[in-house]
Amino acid sequence: MELNQVDIHYLIAAICVISSALIFYKIGVWGERLQRKLKFWHLIFFLLGLLADTVGTSLMEHIAELTHLHDEMHTVTGAIAILLMFVHALWAIWTYVKGTPIEKRHFNRFSIVVWCIWLIPYLIGVYLGMRLHV
């Protein structure tokens, strides 16, 4: 199915916002990994990534409704990723506020796993987007 001008604008906005989520989340996760301790600014980037991913996903959902282009695997993995990002953000806040120094040092293990899982729907979306234009 071909995208019209409105769909293209939604798609461009969604791609920008989802890519912002990738950048925010990557900075938070890898910043935490490199510094070997959970810090306040990592929480900010986790939350910015979650916010951008949620907004981008809602834009993508709107595009899917307009175009009737749905991919079940992308939908399921995307929902799992957002849920994990939400749990990750809550757990990060709890660990930052009440966690022991050891918990703050080891939190990055969970962050890396969540980030890797988040990449799955991101890459599926990239593949689906490229497939649309072939």
Model-found features: residue ranges?
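Short alpha-helical packing/oligomerization segments
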Residues: 64-91
